[in-house]
């Protein structure tokens, strides 16, 4: 049975997701007055007192009209205004993979897959025959143990990791990922040593993934097995149109680069907050995730991950952990930016130099294919 899950036209629409849905939910919408589909009678003694009752005949007649298939990842909450929302399949018709199938008018079910914006909003539907999956290739001699959950990959060090004093240690994870088109990965690390900071990293489709560890103490650190943990979460990415961006260069593999517009210096063991003349005007449910660039990290600068919202200018907090004054010239890349509909928050870490990013999209599921390899 179909059910309308929007309250009023031209107001904020709240979506209700099925608990068994794993990957994608498809909705259909059309510019009509939703009040025509609702009856004015509201039951007082049943649960219908929350939502208006639905005239099933009128609603079925509406569904027989020409509808537009609108594809969105389940984490992308909210739809364009002036739309009527409905589920396009029944729960008992879902496959074991829990992918939602949209049945065309001729009756043939097709499984869709969220691609990038150009393909997702194209006139022709983009479909695949298999469930979207992520290929994980792990080196047998890796220093990391790999644990695959329903929606993320966790890596824990199984060997000692030496982080020299006043240096940035680059640790190769000896793992490669084949990420489907339209998704990206974000690596969030945590160390049991309060003087060791794990730098957040984003990945699109890399075969040689490495992370940065920064030593903030006055002596070298020896991290024992199990002291460092990395979580790789996968989220849908989004490429805004050129007219939706202000003072940002074209992206490279869905990643934008934020460059300095003026020179500045950072004194030893001190913070500075830099604002940038950039802005974007995308949809409300989209946000930009700003990750420090590798050039800045290698200088010994610690940048806090920033969640950039629309209609605002970004302000980045930079910490100089070295004992020397660092000069930043004009035009250097400070941060990398990727747009997504994922949900994040910054966990307050009073004992740490910077706060830690936390991914809140725990309802998404992925199919991981694991393969171990070794050098010939």
From Swiss-Prot:
Q: What are the required cofactors?
A: Mg(2+)
EC number of the protein: 3.6.1.23
Q: Has UniProt tagged this entry with the keyword tRNA-binding?
A: no
Gene Ontology biological process terms, A to Z: dUTP metabolic process
List UniProt keywords, sorted A-Z: Hydrolase, Magnesium, Metal-binding, Nucleotide metabolism
- The enzyme's main class, written as a single word, is hydrolase
Which residues span the membrane?
A: none
Q: Which family does it belong to?
A: Belongs to the dUTPase family.
One Pfam short name: dUTPase
Give GO terms: molecular function aspect only.
dUTP diphosphatase activity; metal ion binding
What this chain does, per the record? Answer: Involved in nucleotide metabolism: produces dUMP, the immediate precursor of thymidine nucleotides and decreases the intracellular concentration of dUTP to avoid uracil incorporation into viral DNA.
Q: What is this protein called?
A: Deoxyuridine 5'-triphosphate nucleotidohydrolase
SUPFAM superfamilies documented for this protein = dUTPase-like
Which reaction(s) does its UniProt entry say it catalyses? dUTP + H2O = dUMP + diphosphate + H(+)
Q: Which InterPro entries does the UniProt record give?
A: dUTPase-like (IPR029054), dUTPase-like_sf (IPR036157), HSV_DUT (IPR034745)
């Amino acid at each position: 049975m179909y059910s309308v899950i929007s309250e009023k036209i031209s107001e904020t629409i709240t979506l209700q997701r099925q608990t068994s849905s794993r990957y994608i939910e498809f909705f259909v919408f059309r510019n009509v007055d939703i009040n025509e589909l609702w009856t004015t009678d509201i039951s007082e003694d049943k649960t219908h007192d929350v939502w208006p009752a639905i005239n099933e005949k009128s609603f079925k007649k509406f569904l027989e009209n020409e509808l537009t298939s609108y594809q969105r990842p389940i984490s992308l909450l909210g739809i364009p205004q002036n739309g009527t929302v409905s589920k396009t399949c029944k729960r008992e018709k879902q496959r074991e993979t829990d992918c939602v199938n949209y049945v065309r008018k001729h009756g043939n079910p097709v499984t869709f897959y969220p691609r990038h914006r150009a393909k997702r909003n194209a006139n022709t539907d983009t479909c695949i025959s298999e469930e979207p999956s992520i290929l994980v290739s792990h080196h047998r001699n890796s220093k990391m143990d790999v644990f695959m959950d329903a929606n993320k990959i966790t890596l824990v060090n199984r060997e000692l990791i030496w982080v020299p004093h006043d240096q940035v240690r680059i640790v190769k994870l000896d793992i490669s990922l084949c990420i489907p088109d339209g998704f990206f990965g974000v690596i969030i690390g945590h160390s049991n040593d309060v003087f060791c900071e794990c730098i957040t990293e984003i990945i699109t489709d890399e075969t040689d993934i490495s992370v940065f560890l920064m030593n903030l103490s006055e002596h070298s650190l020896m991290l024992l097995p199990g002291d460092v943990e990395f979580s790789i979460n996968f989220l849908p990415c989004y490429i805004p149109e050129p007219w939706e961006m202000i003072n940002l260069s074209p992206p490279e593999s869905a990643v934008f680069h934020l460059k300095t517009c003026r020179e500045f210096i950072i004194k030893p063991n001190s913070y500075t907050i830099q604002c940038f003349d950039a802005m974007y005007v995308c949809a409300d449910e989209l946000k930009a995730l700003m990750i420090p660039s590798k050039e800045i990290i290698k200088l010994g600068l610690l940048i806090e991950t920033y969640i950039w919202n629309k209609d605002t200018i970004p302000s980045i907090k930079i910490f100089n952990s070295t004992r020397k004054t660092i000069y930043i010239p004009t035009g250097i890349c400070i941060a990398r930016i990727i747009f997504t509909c994922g949900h994040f928050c910054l966990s307050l870490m009073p004992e740490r130099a910077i706060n830690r990013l936390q991914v809140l999209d725990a309802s998404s599921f992925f199919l991981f294919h694991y393969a171990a390899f070794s050098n010939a």
